[in-house]
Amino acid sequence: MAQNDKYILFISMNLISSSPVNRRNFLRGTGLCLALPFLESGASKALAAVEPARHKKILAIGNHLGFYPGAFFPQEEGMDYVSSPTLKNVEKHRKDFTVFSHLDHDVSGGHGGVNSFLSGVRKQESKGFPEKNVSLDQIAAEHVGSAARFPSITAGIGEGTDMCWTRTGVRIPPVNSPARLFNALFTQSPQSERIIERERLTHRGSVLDALMGSAKSLQGRLNGFDRDKLDQYLTSIREVEHRLQMSKEWLDRPKPEPGIQPITDEQRMHIEEMPLFFDLLTLALQTDSTRVATFEIPLGFSTTDLDGVSYGYHGLSHHSKGEDKLTELQVAEDYIFSQVNRLFNSLQEAKIFDDTLVIVGSGMSDGSRHSNKDLPVLMAGGGLKHQGHIVSPEEHQKRVPLSNLWLSALQWFGVERDDFGKSTGTFSGLNFS
C-alpha cells in the first residue's frame, strides 16, 4: 500500500515525575510516529445486486456549524409532525428516522465545544475522564476489531470537524480525498509492495516491543501518579500493536470489486465531493470492508459553489436572523439534507439500511449564537421503530444527556457497557431492542 494511503498516529508520553528517572533518555525513544494502514472506506448503488453481509453498522455524519434551529426542529411531537423546511428534504423517509429535541452534552465553548459531539466530553476537559474524550465510533470500532478490514473509517471534507477521538485522547483526522479512499478500499497492492509493507509492520512491531520493555522497567521506580501516566502509555502501545497485527492479517486478503470506475485524484468542488464520499461509504459498509464510518462537514464547507449563495458557510452561520443570510443558509442546509436523502436511498438499494444506524447532527446548535445547547440530532435506519419527533424535558434538572442516546446506540451495536461519556443511563424514549 502506498505511503499516502495511510494516516499517522502519534503516541507520546508525558512523565511529570519527581522520581529519580532520567526522563530525557527515556523519552528519546518514546516520541513515536507510526504510519498505520488507513482506517477508512466507502459506498454506492453499484453493488445493489450483491447480497450484503448481515452485520450491524454505524454511520455518523457531523456538520461543524449545526443546522439553523428555526428550520430544523418540527413544532409538533410524535409521528404526525409537520416537516420543517430542512426535514422536507428527507420527507420520503419520515418513517425511517427520529428527530430529537433538547439533547446536548451540557458543554459550552462554541466552536471549541463541537469536538464533543460523538464523545460527550470536550477535548479540553478530557483529562478528568478515564477514557478521555473517546468517541462513539471508536468504541464501536474496538468492538469490530479484526472482523472487518477497517475497524472504522473517518472521512470528510477539508480539515473536518474534530469529531473522532481515541480513548487516549488522540484525534483521528478524516481522509479528505475520494480517490485516496477508493484506493484504500478497492485497489490491491502488487505483491512486491505487500512484501515491503509486511517488513515495515514487522519492524514497527519490534520497535514497540523494545519500547514496551523499556517502559515496564520503570514501573518500580515511579510514584503513583507517574505509574498512572505510564499505564496510559502502555495502553497506547498495546493499541498500536493490536492494529499492527490486524494489518498483517488483512495484508494478503483480496479487496472487493467496487463495481464502479476508479475515482481519479483531481480537484473537485465540495458539493461534488460529498455525494462521492457517501457512495464510497455505502460501498464500504455493503462490502463489509468496515462496519463503522464517519463523515465530517467542516466550518470551511464551500457554500458559494451552490447556485444562489454568495456568502461563505461561516459567514452564513452568523446570520443574526437577517433575511438574506437565512435564505442562503437554507439553500446550503437543503443541499446537505438532499445528499442525506440520497444516502438513505442508496443504503436502502444496497439492502443495508435496516442494519445501519445513521446519525446526523452536530456539536453546535446555532452558529449565530455559538451555542452548544439543544443540538440538532437525527437518527435513522437500524431496523428501529422510529418515533418521528421525540421532545425530551427542557428543564435543567430533568434534561437527558445526549450521551444516553449514544450509550443506547452502542448497546444496539453489541457493545457491552453501562456508561459512555456523561451518560446517566440509556435513552428510554426510543426502543433499540
Where is each model-derived feature located?
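Ligand-binding pockets and gating/stacking loops
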Residues: 8-433
